[in-house]
């Protein structure tokens, strides 16, 4: 029996809009939109008109759909956005249009990585939570990983960056102590560590961190201990239970905390479950740091071989699912000239 042929008249406006997007037919797409077609429509494959246009590199159709309010951050059943489709297919022009749309939207709305503290999972919840230490991970009570041993090579690279000029080093967020152990290898003049979780702080003392000659431990949330901080030659920031807004807030204090010519870096786990969203946030944070007077170099580090399925056994949430980690190295624009 032959399958039934669906005529254009029988197709919904949404299906026709997907078809126009696939064909790159901008005039038809605009006509359908003006007639009330839903730009956020998902077809039977779970794809939006914008995804179809992006997948095939129809840049003008991508622009028209975005101008009509098509959601740039909608996800397919395979967890891919329109930007992912254009990126994977090598459609550079469409990709750049979507990237700019994502950056502009996040500058204004911040819908992906920014969350309000009222929605739970805030730093306050974490600081009151019990944590569990094991040889290869630090976990909260929901079996979410606070820090894991696979990050060790990344932390060593971060330490190398922030210690490149020697002097006085600040780390915000001790976790398993991976980055601080690496920092110690460079024998900094002083090594200040800010840690807010009481159990992590206790473990630091138990394992001798309070007895190291060049180490100063400050217990508390970084927001509450700013008056105890000085200025540093290298700074690393990696807190758990905070959001992008907290990182942005910390960046506002860099002009006071980072000495001229100093190096700043942070754990770049922004949107670590989606490649395109991660690119958007790498660009966004670089742009916002530039507005504060800092240049950002993103150094690609392959991590695929570190992340077999066994790494995530017993962990409820894979906070990193990408093949490459982009390590940020930030320096004042004046100091790097």
What are these regions (language model features)?
Residues 28, 60-61, 93-94:
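Conserved ankyrin/ankyrin-like repeat signature
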Residues 245-331:
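C-terminal substrate-binding/active-site "lid" region of AdoMet-derived donor-dependent transferases
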């Amino acid at each position: 029996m032959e399958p039934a042929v669906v005529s254009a008249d029988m197709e919904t406006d949404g299906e026709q809009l997907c078809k126009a997007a696939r064909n790159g037919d901008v005039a038809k797409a605009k006509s359908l939109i003006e007639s009330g077609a839903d730009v956020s429509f998902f077809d039977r494959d779970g794809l939006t008109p914008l995804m179809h246009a992006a997948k095939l590199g129809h840049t003008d159709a991508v622009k028209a759909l975005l101008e009509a309010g098509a959601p740039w951050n909608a996800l397919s059943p395979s967890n891919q956005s329109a930007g992912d489709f254009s990126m994977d297919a090598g459609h550079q022009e469409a990709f750049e249009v979507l990237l700019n749309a994502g950056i502009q939207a996040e500058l204004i709305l911040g819908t992906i990585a920014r969350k309000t503290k009222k929605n739970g999972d805030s730093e306050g919840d974490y600081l009151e939570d019990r944590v569990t230490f094991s040889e290869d991970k630090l976990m909260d009570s929901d079996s979410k990983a606070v820090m894991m041993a696979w990050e060790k090579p990344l932390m060593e690279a971060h330490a190398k960056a922030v210690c490149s000029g020697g002097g006085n080093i600040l780390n915000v967020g001790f976790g398993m102590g991976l980055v601080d152990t690496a920092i110690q290898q460079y024998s900094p003049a002083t090594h200040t560590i800010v840690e807010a979780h009481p159990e992590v702080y206790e473990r630091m003392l138990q394992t001798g961190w309070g007895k190291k000659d060049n180490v100063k431990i400050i217990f508390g949330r970084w927001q509450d201990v700013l008056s105890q901080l000085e200025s540093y030659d290298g700074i690393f920031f990696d807190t758990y239970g905070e959001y992008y807004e907290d990182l942005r807030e910390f960046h506002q204090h860099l002009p006071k905390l980072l000495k001229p010519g100093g190096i700043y870096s942070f754990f770049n786990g922004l949107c670590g479950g989606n490649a395109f969203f991660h690119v958007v946030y790498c660009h966004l944070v670089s742009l916002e740091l530039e507005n504060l007077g800092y240049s950002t170099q993103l150094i690609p580090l392959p991590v695929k071989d570190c992340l077999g399925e066994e790494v995530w056994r017993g962990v409820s949430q894979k906070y990193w699912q990408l093949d490459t980690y982009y390590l940020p190295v930030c320096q004042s624009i004046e100091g790097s000239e």
